[in-house]
């Protein structure tokens, strides 16, 4: 079980921002990544459809031996996380809890903005999670439905996306938030635009980065680090990157798409660079 891969899935390429952090934080771990581009974006879809898509993909990953499931999609995590933890005997890591913890720690004035898909914002998942952590924090949530389609088309700079960001983020500027949660794993590709609009004095919390950091913590807690990792007496040893001296077999990282694998590969290289040499079409999931 320890040497099995980590299963990661998202509605498209956005979850690769999570995969990139996992690679940085746990470099000897193998990964199976599925991007459900056949059904992207998840944001505007009905809750029942998102749960159905997510269940089919997670079932497939577990059936292929994943030792952990990472839901690298805020929309999916907002409606599927609790169900997934009931369904599977492996740890399931979501994105909302770690990002919320970071936002609560980061805010100085107690006003936090959350941006995400329509589905994520409508679910109230971030609002509830942050309120549970600190009920005194004001949470101002804004849905940004066009951000994901722009990122999926590879458009992350330029006048059009800048104008869109200014319109979406104006309500957060008006209430004076000092921290903004990027509540979609596609949004780190828009960090430059969002930071420019919000200003340097506003802290951006990447849900992707926070979820990626959560993975080695859970691996340690569940004693699931693979045999390539050193014997660690605490998580601090793992965080110290002592694994860098390991000279054993290379981890296996596979990337699959329910849609066009060639288009996925072109976009995916913006997230993980040339390490993505091949993307396969995953069979049996497109008719979910």
UniProtKB/Swiss-Prot annotation:
Gene Ontology biological process terms from the UniProt entry: cell wall organization; peptidoglycan biosynthetic process; regulation of cell shape
Active site: 73, 184
Signal peptide extent: none
Highest taxon above the source species: Bacteria
MF terms (GO), sorted A to Z: glutamate racemase activity
Disulfides per UniProt: none
EC number(s) recorded for this UniProt protein: 5.1.1.3
Uppermost EC category: isomerase
Keywords: Cell shape, Cell wall biogenesis/degradation, Isomerase, Peptidoglycan synthesis
Catalytic activity: L-glutamate = D-glutamate
ATP-binding in keyword set: no
Pathway noted in the entry: Cell wall biogenesis; peptidoglycan biosynthesis
A Pfam family that the UniProt record links to this protein: Asp_Glu_race
Binding residues for substrate: 10-11, 42-43, 74-75, 185-186
Family of this protein: Belongs to the aspartate/glutamate racemases family.
Chain's role: Provides the (R)-glutamate required for cell wall biosynthesis.
Protein's recorded name: Glutamate racemase
Annotated organism of origin: Corynebacterium kroppenstedtii (strain DSM 44385 / JCM 11950 / CIP 105744 / CCUG 35717)
Gene: murI
């Amino acid at each position: 079980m320890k040497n099995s891969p980590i299963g990661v899935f998202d509605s498209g390429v956005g979850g690769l921002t999570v995969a990139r952090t996992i690679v940085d934080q746990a470099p000897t771990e193998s990964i199976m990544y599925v991007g459900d581009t056949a059904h992207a974006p998840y944001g505007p879809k009905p809750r029942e459809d998102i749960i159905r898509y997510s269940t089919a993909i997670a079932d497939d990953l577990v059936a292929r031996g994943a030792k952990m499931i990472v839901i690298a999609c805020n929309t999916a995590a907002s409606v599927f996380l609790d169900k997934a933890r009931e369904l599977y005997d492996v740890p399931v890591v979501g994105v909302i809890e770690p990002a919320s913890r970071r936002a609560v720690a980061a805010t100085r004035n107690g006003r936090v903005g959350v941006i995400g898909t329509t589905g994520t914002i409508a679910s109230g998942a971030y609002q509830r999670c942050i309120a549970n952590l600190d009920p005194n924090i004001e949470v101002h949530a804004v849905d940004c439905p066009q951000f994901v389609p722009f990122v999926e088309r590879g458009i992350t700079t330029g006048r059009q996306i800048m104008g869109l960001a200014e319109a979406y983020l104006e309500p957060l500027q008006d209430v004076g938030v000092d921290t903004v949660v990027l509540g979609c794993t596609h949004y780190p590709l828009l960090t430059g635009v969002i930071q420019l609009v919000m200003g340097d004095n506003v802290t951006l919390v990447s849900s992707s980065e926070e979820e990626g950091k959560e993975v080695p913590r859970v691996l340690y807690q569940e004693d699931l680090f693979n045999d390539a990792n050193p014997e660690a007496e605490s998580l601090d040893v793992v965080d110290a990157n002592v694994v860098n001296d390991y000279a054993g077999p290379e981890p296996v990282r596979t990337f699959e798409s329910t849609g066009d694998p060639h288009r996925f590969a072109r976009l995916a290289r913006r997230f993980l660079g040339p390490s993505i040499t091949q993307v396969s079409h995953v069979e049996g999931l497109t008719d979910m």
